[in-house]
Every structure is written in structure tokens, then in C-alpha cells.
């Protein structure tokens, strides 16, 4: 590291609380903190002072420009950079930045997805400063986290609905806590997203069109060794990878990102970074930044960072575990069971709300993790199934069972494990194991939503989760606020809701085929693909939910459905076209060149009176497979040409049912040819080349 003092390094490029205290007048600082804490509007005078202080600080860090940094419906971040310079009368420039420029920007909104909310010619859009997420300096620019909306006020981004959902759950959770005699002004959800990724050599990446255009390999035969030896997970870091991770930590720490854990993952070349949890909107910004920084740092080390959910067939893909909890402004974690969870009525009530939310809004949670990339993982024995269920562990299960049955609860779970060696002390045994096949698992004092794909913006999953739980808390508060006997009413409510929603709790193996049958018996949803999931965005119960909590309007929900269907279709179209190009321009010419060499060898042997049986046999196999590849590629082109163009939903189902099958048909002979054609002829690096030489 260039700086070894980590506390000094951490947040050094962030306009954080420490900097604000140093650079803002006391009254301005207090007003800004009130805005950040309570979500109140910021007045123009305060904004002007903050803007000047922010500009001066940014210049001291080497910034010459500023940008309103936002997250449109593409799921990635967007930025337009303006310099601080303002011309003076004498032909020079001054460095200026006004309160108005801080609070509001005006990017062109016509080139971002709107899902029908805006016509192409309706270009005006606005960005609005989010003061709850710190500004920072990166690459010579001051980055100001913002929300993004249209000229008519319709939301066009990921951040605004997230902030609204956080307000919704705060409002309803505070109502519940008031019933328990607690004076809480604000409740926030917190998230710690674990980020998986692949690192491959940049030279290999540059030689593969599929990786460049789609982020994943469309062809590739399995090498002799994959991940079956279990020797990569938590294995020793190779020097190049360790150097990358060290550099990554430093860059993330500068930006105030709490990078905590790093290790090798299951697949070759696969790794993970996990941060300490923080407030959800900040965690979302930080995760977007993390993915950007990963790509940048990877280039410096001669790598390319792959964030696609399934870059390589035959080995695990990458996900992103969303560790979610709820905390009060007094620091209390509402999902902390305490020493005696059976006696912690408040915790059990919040747990019940989450169980009810996950059951009633399984469709929204499934939608929030749906994508073309994640379709390769969900239900593929490497990630949770596409069926949403919950795992709460043995102790909590026993507590809920006793509440439902009315039987007395007996605590048998607090034990210690004796490891059988005198030098090793007895260690406390957790009251629950970890079920890695569960999409939504309780892990001690938080829920781990494990179905997210590695490339996804975590905002959507947390919007769904926050809003669904807010609705259940609202219903609970409405019922309990009028209760004459609060304790009896709480107990009756919990008992009723557990009985009604226990179907969502599953403790078994989610990879087992029997779970699909069992889930169907329970009436759980099974959306096998993104194409199946997205249309349920606009189910009436979901429209009602978001309208009730002021998270989305009906038009905004419809726009998100259309945007995601359109994105799904575009991704699969690009993949199909890339596959066709690679067959036509690379694989087929390579096979023909190899055939020509084989034919020359066969003819030379014949002329010399030597039998060329092996060469002739190989020539026949390669020729036959090349013909098959050519025919299947032509069929793929025909399938793509027939995609419906009048309806995104129809097109999505067509891509899933027809085009993907046609792509599989193309890949099969190509992968066989890779194992037959001489290495010097094969036109791009193979899995063996890519996965084992970093």
C-alpha cells in the first residue's frame, strides 16, 4: 500500500461528517445534519454555503470538475462532468460552484430507459442531490450522489424508490415501536452486500468477442479439471490476485467503503469481497462504486473483472448476498433475538412481519433478482432455487411452533461444542446451521437474501423488501393500536399470521427435485425464468402496495416492467448475434483450415503408400461437426429474425423458449470441435487457457 495508516486513509476522498464539521459554520452543519437525519428539505442559503465548502475541499483533493452521479433504470451509474471554471471579465477563469448547481442538475433524459414514461423528443430530466449519501472525489471529479426524475416528476432511477421505501418502513416500524413504549424518530434498513466476481487475464479477454460483447462465454468445452477438487475456495491467494485485492482495498477505503473480507470463491478465478453493513441507500451507492472500482483496478493489474452471473459454463457463477436488517436511530437492531428470543415479543413480531411479507410478496422478491444472466444460476445447484422460501433455523422454528400450538417452549439450543482436543477451548454452538440452498435465510441478527445476481443493482431487491415489510407492519399497527389488551392482541396476531404463512418456511435441501413438488403443494410460486417473472410486476396487489406507500405510481411500475423486459430481450439478441458472428468469422474458418491440413496429410500419406486412417477419421468427424455447426447457426439466424416485435412480453417468452434453445444447439457442435481441432487453429482462448493461468 502507498499509505499504511488505514484510519488516515479511510474516507480521505469523502466529504464526510468530519470534513463537514471542519469546513461548515456550526449553524449550517446542524441544519444539514437535520436534513440528513430527518429527511427534511434543505433551504437555498444552506445549500450555497455547503456548495462552496464542498468545492473548496474537492479542489484541495485535485478535482477540477463535478458530476451529478445517478442510477438510471439501466441499473448502472451515469455521470456528466462539468468543470468548476467560470470566465472572468479579464479573460481568466474562477473556480465556482453554486448551491443551485449542487441541488439540481439537468441531464438529457431521452437517452435513458423510461419504459414508455417519456417520448424520445421529451428530453428534459432532473437530478436532485441526496444529502444522506456523502459526496466524494474520484478521478479528478467531485461526485454528488443524486436522484433522477423526468420533467413531469416521474422517477427514472433506482435511488428514488429506494429512499421512498426506506421512509415507508421507517414510518410503520416507528408505529410498532411506539406500542412497545419506545420513543424512536427514525428506523433505517441496513445492508451488507457480498460481491462475487471473476478475474481473468486481460489479454485472454481481448481475444474473445463473446466476453467483450456479452460479458460471458458463449462457447467453451470443459477442461479436464473444473472446481470438483474444492481446492480454490478459501485457498491461498496467488500473488497477482493478492496484489489486486490489496490495491482494491486501498481504493475502496479512500472512498469510505467498508471493505472487510476477501477470499477465493468456489470456481477457478472466482473471488469475493464483503463489506461491513451500512444504511441501505449508502450501501447501494457503495456497491455500485465497488463494481466500478473493481473494473478499474483490475485493468491496472492486467486483469479484466467479470461481473456477469455466469461467465463460464460448467463452474459456479457469481451472486451477491444481500444481508438485510432493521435498526433504530438509537442503535437497536430490530432483528436481534437477544439472549432469550422466546421472551422477546418485539423481535418475534418483527420476524412475523418479515415472514408474512416474503410469503405474500414472493413474486416481487423473485422479480427483483430476475435477469437474463441470473437465469443461468437460479435453480442450477449453485445458487438458491427460483422458488422463494425462508430458512429461520431450529430455535426460531421451535419458538414459532410453540406459539402456534400453544405449547410451552423448552430451550434446548444453547450448548457448547467440545472439539475433543485439550488445547482447543469449548466454543458456543450457534442455534442454527446455515442452509446455503435457501434464498432468504435468517443468519443470527439479519436476513441474507441470496438470490441476487452479481451484476445487479441492489436497490430493486431492497425496494421490494422494504415496501413489503412496511405493509405488514402497517397492518399490524392498525390492528394493535386499538387493542385493549396489547400483550394478548400481539400473541393472537403472531399465532394467526404464523399459521397462515408458515408455508414459506423450508428447512430442507432447496436443490432437491422433491422441493419443486413440495413447493407446488404449498402453493408457492415458481417463476423459472425472468420472462415468467417480469409480467407480475403489474399484478393488482403489487400496484396497490406501491401506491399505498408512495413508492411507485402505476405508470412507474408499468415502465419498470417494460424496461426490464426490453433489457432482457436486448441482452439475448446481442448474445445470439455474437454467437452467429463467432461461428461465421472465427470457428468455421478455423475448422476449414484444420480440415485442409488434415486433407493434405491424408493425401500425402496416400501418395507415399501409407495408410492415413486416423487422419481420415478425424477429418470426417471435424467435417461432419462443421456442417452441423453451420446448419445450426443458420437456424439460429432464422429464429432471431422471427422474434415478435410488437410486444416485449411476447418477445421475452420467444427468446427464452426458442432463441436460447437454438443457441444451445449451436454451442453443442462447437464445443465438440474445440476438443478435436488443433490448438494452433482454435481462434480464441479456451477455458483451460483462461481459468488456470492467473
Q: Predicted segment positions?
A:
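Active-site core of metal-dependent hydrolases
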Residues: 9-122
Amino acid at each position: 500500500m502507498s499509505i499504511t495508516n488505514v484510519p488516515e486513509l479511510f474516507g480521505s476522498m469523502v466529504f464526510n461528517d468530519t470534513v463537514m464539521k471542519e469546513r461548515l459554520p456550526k449553524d449550517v452543519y446542524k441544519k444539514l445534519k437535520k436534513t440528513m437525519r430527518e429527511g427534511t428539505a434543505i433551504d437555498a442559503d444552506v445549500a450555497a454555503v455547503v456548495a462552496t465548502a464542498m468545492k473548496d475541499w474537492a479542489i484541495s483533493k485535485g478535482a477540477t470538475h463535478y458530476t451529478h452521479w445517478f442510477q438510471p433504470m439501466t441499473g448502472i451509474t451515469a455521470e456528466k462532468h462539468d468543470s468548476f471554471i467560470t470566465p472572468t471579465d479579464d479573460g481568466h477563469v474562477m473556480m465556482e460552484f453554486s448551491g443551485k448547481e449542487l441541488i439540481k442538475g439537468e441531464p438529457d433524459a431521452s437517452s435513458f430507459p423510461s419504459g414508455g414514461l417519456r417520448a424520445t423528443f421529451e428530453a428534459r430530466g432532473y437530478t436532485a442531490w441526496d444529502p444522506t449519501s456523502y459526496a466524494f472525489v474520484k478521478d479528478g471529479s467531485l461526485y454528488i450522489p443524486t436522484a433522477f426524475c423526468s420533467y413531469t416528476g416521474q422517477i427514472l432511477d433506482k435511488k428514488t424508490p429506494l429512499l421512498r421505501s426506506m421512509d415507508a418502513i421507517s414510518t410503520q416500524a416507528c408505529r410498532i415501536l411506539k406500542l412497545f413504549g419506545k420513543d424512536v424518530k427514525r428506523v433505517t434498513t441496513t445492508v451488507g452486500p457480498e460481491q462475487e466476481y471473476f478475474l481473468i487475464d486481460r489479454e485472454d479477454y481481448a481475444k474473445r468477442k463473446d466476453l467483450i460483447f456479452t460479458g460471458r462465454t458463449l462457447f467453451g468445452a470443459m477442461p479436464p479439471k473444473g472446481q470438483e477438487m474444492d481446492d480454490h475456495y478459501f485457498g491461498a491467494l496467488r500473488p497477482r490476485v493478492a496484489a489486486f485485492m490489496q490495491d482494491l482495498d486501498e481504493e475502496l477505503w479512500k472512498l469510505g467503503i467498508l471493505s472487510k473480507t476477501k477470499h477465493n470463491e468456489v470456481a477457478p478465478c472466482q473471488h469475493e469481497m464483503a463489506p461491513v453493513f451500512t444504511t441501505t441507500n449508502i450501501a447501494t451507492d457503495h456497491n455500485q462504486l465497488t463494481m466500478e472500482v473493481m473494473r478499474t483496478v483490475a485493468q491496472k493489474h492486467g486483469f479484466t473483472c467479470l461481473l456477469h452471473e455466469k461467465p463460464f459454463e460448467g463452474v459456479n457463477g457469481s451472486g451477491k448476498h444481500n444481508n438485510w436488517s432493521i435498526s433504530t436511530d438509537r442503535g437497536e437492531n430490530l432483528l436481534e433475538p437477544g439472549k432469550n428470543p422466546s421472551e422477546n415479543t418485539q423481535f418475534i413480531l418483527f420476524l412475523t412481519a418479515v415472514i408474512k411479507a416474503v410469503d405474500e410478496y414472493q413474486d416481487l422478491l423473485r422479480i427483483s433478482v430476475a435477469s437474463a444472466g441470473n437465469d443461468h444460476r437460479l435453480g442450477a445447484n449453485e445458487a438458491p432455487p427460483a422458488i422463494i422460501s425462508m430458512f429461520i433455523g431450529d430455535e426460531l422454528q421451535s419458538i414459532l411452533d410453540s406459539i402456534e400450538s400453544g405449547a410451552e417452549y423448552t430451550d434446548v439450543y444453547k450448548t457448547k461444542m467440545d472439539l475433543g482436543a485439550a488445547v482447543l477451548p469449548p466454543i458456543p454452538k450457534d442455534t442454527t446451521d446455515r442452509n446455503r440452498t435457501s434464498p432468504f435465510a435468517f443468519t443470527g441478527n439479519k436476513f441474507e437474501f441470496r438470490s441476487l445476481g452479481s451484476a445487479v443493482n441492489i436497490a430493486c431487491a431492497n425496494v421490494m423488501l422494504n415496501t413489503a415489510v412496511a405493509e405488514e407492519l402497517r397492518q399490524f399497527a392498525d390492528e394493535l393500536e386499538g387493542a385493549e389488551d396489547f400483550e394478548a392482541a400481539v400473541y393472537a396476531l403472531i399465532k394467526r399470521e404464523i399459521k397462515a404463512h408458515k408455508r414459506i418456511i423450508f428447512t430442507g435441501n432447496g436443490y432437491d427435485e422433491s422441493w419443486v413438488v413440495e413447493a407446488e403443494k404449498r402453493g408457492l410460486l415458481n417463476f423459472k425464468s425472468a420472462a415468467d417473472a417480469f409480467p407480475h410486476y403489474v399484478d393488482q396487489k403489487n400496484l396497490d402496495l406501491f401506491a399505498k406507500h408512495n413508492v411507485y405510481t402505476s405508470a412507474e411500475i408499468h415502465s419498470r416492467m417494460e424496461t426490464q423486459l426490453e433489457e432482457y430481450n436486448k441482452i439475448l439478441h446481442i448474445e445470439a448475434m455474437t454467437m452467429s458472428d463467432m461461428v461465421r468469422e472465427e470457428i468455421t474458418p478455423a475448422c476449414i483450415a484444420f480440415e485442409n491440413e488434415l486433407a493434405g496429410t491424408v493425401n500425402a500419406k496416400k501418395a507415399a503408400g501409407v495408410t492415413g486412417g486416423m487422419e481420415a477419421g478425424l477429418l470426417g468427424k471435424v467435417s461432419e461437426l462443421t456442417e452441423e455447426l453451420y446448419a445450426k447457426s443458420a437456424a439460429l439466424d432464422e429464429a432471431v429474425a422471427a422474434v415478435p416485435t410488437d410486444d416485449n412480453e411476447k418477445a421475452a417468452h420467444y427468446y427464452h423458449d426458442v432463441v436460447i434453445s437454438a443457441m444451445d444447439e449451436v454451442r453443442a457442435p462447437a464445443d465438440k470441435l474445440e476438443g478435436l481441432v488443433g490448438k494452433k487453429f482454435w481462434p480464441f482462448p479456451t477455458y483451460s487457457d483462461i481459468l488456470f493461468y492467473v
